[in-house]
Structure formats: C-alpha cells, structure tokens
C-alpha cells in the first residue's frame, strides 16, 4: 500500500490526500497566473498604443465580468462535476492566453478583440473557487476543513505577493514571454487536476471513516449534476433559498459583506493618501505586501487554532482584531511604517475568519448544493466591492484620509457587533463538534 492511498490518509489526511493536493496545486497555478494579469493587461494595452485610461477600462471590464460570472459560477459547478468545471476553467484560460499571445505577435491593435478574450478567460476563472470547495467537501474530513481553508488562504496570499513582481520581471525581458508564461501556468494546472478516480477514492475513504446513517455514501454521480433535472435559474434560486432559510448562513452573508466593504475601502484610501503625499508606487506596494505577509503568517496558525477554539471564538477574535487595526489606522496613517506594521498584524487573523466561515458552510451544506450556496453567500461581498471602490475615491476627495478611514472602520465595527449579537454566529462550536452532512 503506497503512502498516498486513502487507506493511509488518516495518518496525515491533507498531505496524503492526492485529490486535495492536486486541486490545491491547480488553484495555485491559476491564481498565480491571475495575479500576474494586472501587469500583463496594463502592458498589453499600452503596447497596442492605448492610454492608461484605456487600460483601466479594460481592467474594469474584467472586474465586472468576474463579479457577474461569480454570481452564477457555483450554480454551474453544481450542474457538472467539480473536476469537469476545473478542466473547463484551465482549458479556457490556457487557450485565452494563447489567443492574446497570437494577437500580440500578429501586430494587431484591436483593443476590442483583446478585451473579448480577457473577458472570456476571466469568466472561466470564476469556476475555480466553487470547484475547489466542492472537492474539499467531498474528500476532506470535517476536522481538517480548517487546515484545508488555511492552505487556500496561504496560496492566495502568496500568489498576490509574488504574482506582480514575477510578471514585472518577465515583462522586462519580453511581453511575449510573459503571455506564454501565463498560458503555461494554466496548462500545467490543467495537467494536475485530480482524476475522477482519485476524488471517488477519497470520497469513499471519508465516508467509511464517518459513515452516514444507514451506511449510505455519496457517490460521484450523486454530486455530478444535481441540478440537471431543473433549470439553472431554479438552481440559482435554490442557493438563495438555502441561505435565507438558515439564519446562521444569512448572518454570515451579512457579516462578510459588511466586513469586505471596509477591507476594500481602507486599502484604497491609504493608496490615495500615500500617492498624494508623494510616496512612490514601490512604497505603496510595500504597504500592500505587509498585509499579505500578515495573511501568510496567519494561515500557518489556522490548523492549530481550529483544533482548539470554537468557530465563534475564531470569528469574533478575527473581526475584532481587524476592526482594531482599522481604527488605529485612522490616527496613525501619517506614519507609514506604523501603518504597515498595523496592516501586517491585521492580516494575521483573516485566515482564521475565512476558514471558520468556509469550514462551517462545507460541513453543513450537502455536497450537491455547495457551489450554489457559496455563490449566494458571495453576492453581498461582490455587490459591495464596487461601492467601496467608488466611495473610497469620492470620500477621499471630499473628506480627506482621516474621515474616510473612520467611515470604513465604522463598518468593520458594525460587522463585529453583528458577530456578537447573532446567536447563530456567537454559538458556533469547534470544527470537531460540527455534524458533517457529507459523511
């Protein structure tokens, strides 16, 4: 028996779980490619004789596509196996970057053609997250959901930290080489997507360790396309119905939406402030990197914390720490290095907060509906991001940095208050005490 077989997985579940590991690797490669896109798109548009304003417009189209596609991506994943959805995403992104490379090498200056290709691969990339969550729910025991979420947090933070510098370095050599590198990342991601057999094996191993009442198990076909008997709109409505019917899920949607409004607006406000104060883009990058470093550090603690603390305690401590850091920024933002330290400290509890939410959703939602539920929960987050982006610019121009930072910090405090007053969130148990509906 090899170390990677399901029979030995309980000794070190995540490290031995090839279905999870290959999924995490595929997502890491896709997210690194995505993090490089900001540099790639900007350089590509300017190389086509476009202005910075035109580059911003193309980036806006991609962001808008990501938001709208994200609303229904979970529903789409629920109507196909997560493996097929991940293959579709990787393939489309690979072909998309090949198309952009061909466009660049042809000498074309068609911004419209470039935008259409980028919109297509951006839409496809939104299938990644719900596919990963569905595979995790199917193959990872409930006691390891916190660690699985922590790996995802660390992976995303690492991609954000290193993606832009790597892209800038490669672009300095050749823009064509950068485009080829991004396509290659997505192609390798396609190659490491877990096999159907691997997912089925770990699903069976999980269910055999935690047998469902009556000895039933969830098969691959059970979760492959649960919505095929109804329309995609009906599946979308079902995701919302499940969230609205569960007071805890509804509270999670409210808390995450409000918190994300604050965490989107405050960094932008600080960027505007430091730019207006004459700081170079390098120092602004250092500030954003400090937060990412904090998230990376915090991700190493999630497994330890989720084993010992209730999810409610994790969530309250995380939101409280972030709120305290944002309130501190109101007063210390004129001092750059003090702000960077506070940003790094505020990033440490974020993985625990996200892990507690994702672990609860994955443990308490049946596998067949996980994609649509995650999409429904993501709507408030995605809906408030553009509002926060707009508010940061408008309020900074009208009020200045201090008042704008205080405005956003108040929303973070409000999310903490909701965590404290909602019984469903205040009483969440430890991960080990959750009843896993997928076992």
Regions found by a protein language model. Name each.
Residues 111-122, 147-206, 285, 289-290, ...:
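Hydrophobic alpha-helical transmembrane segments
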Residues 41, 127-140, 352-365:
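Intracellular juxtamembrane helix-capping segments at the cytosolic ends
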Residues 19-27, 86, 114, 248-253, ...:
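Hydrophobic alpha-helix/TM-entry signal in multi-pass membrane transporters
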Residues 28, 109-127, 338-352:
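Hydrophobic core of transmembrane alpha-helices in multi-pass small-molecule transporters
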């Amino acid at each position: 028996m090899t170390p990677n077989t399901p029979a030995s997985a309980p000794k070190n579940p995540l490290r031995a779980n090839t279905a999870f590991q290959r999924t995490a690797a595929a997502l890491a490669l896709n997210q690194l490619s995505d993090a490089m896109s900001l540099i790639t798109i900007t350089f590509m548009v300017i190389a086509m004789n476009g202005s910075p304003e035109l580059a911003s417009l193309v980036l806006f189209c991609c962001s808008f596509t990501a938001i709208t596609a994200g609303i229904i991506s979970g529903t789409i994943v629920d109507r196909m196996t997560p493996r097929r959805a991940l293959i579709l995403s990787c393939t489309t992104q690979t072909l998309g970057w090949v198309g952009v490379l061909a466009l660049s090498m042809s000498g074309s200056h068609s911004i419209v053609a470039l935008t259409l290709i980028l919109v297509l691969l951006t839409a496809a990339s939104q299938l990644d997250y719900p596919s990963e969550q569905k595979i995790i729910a199917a193959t990872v025991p409930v006691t390891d959901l916190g660690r699985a979420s922590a790996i995802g947090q660390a992976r995303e933070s690492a991609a954000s930290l290193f993606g832009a510098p790597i892209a800038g370095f490669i672009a300095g050599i050749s823009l064509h080489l950068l485009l080829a590198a991004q396509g290659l990342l997505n192609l390798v991601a396609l190659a490491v997507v877990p096999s159907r057999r691997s997912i089925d094996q770990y699903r069976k191993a999980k269910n055999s360790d935690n047998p469902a009442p009556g000895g039933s198990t969830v098969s691959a076909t059970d979760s492959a396309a649960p919505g095929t008997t109804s329309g995609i709109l009906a599946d979308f409505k079902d995701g919302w119905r499940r969230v609205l019917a569960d007071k805890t899920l509804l509270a999670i949607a409210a808390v995450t939406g409000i918190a994300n409004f604050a965490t989107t607006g405050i960094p932008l406000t600080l960027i505007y402030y430091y730019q207006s104060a004459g700081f170079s883009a390098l120092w602004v990058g250092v500030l954003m990197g400090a937060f990412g470093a904090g998230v990376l550090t915090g991700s190493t603690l999630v497994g330890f914390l989720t084993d010992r603390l209730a999810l409610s305690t994790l969530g309250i401590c995380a939101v409280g720490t972030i709120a305290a850091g944002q309130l501190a920024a109101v007063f210390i933002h004129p001092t750059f290095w003090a702000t960077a330290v506070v940003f790094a400290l505020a990033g440490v509890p974020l993985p625990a907060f996200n892990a507690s939410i994702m672990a609860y959703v994955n443990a308490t939602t049946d596998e067949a509906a996980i994609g649509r539920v995650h999409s429904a929960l993501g709507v408030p987050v995605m809906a408030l991001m553009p509002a926060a982006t707009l508010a940061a610019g408008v309020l900074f121009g009208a009020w200045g940095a201090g008042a704008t930072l205080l405005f956003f910090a108040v929303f973070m405090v409000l999310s903490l208050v909701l965590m404290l007053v909602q019984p469903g969130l205040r009483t969440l148990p430890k991960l080990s005490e959750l009843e896993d509906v997928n076992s």
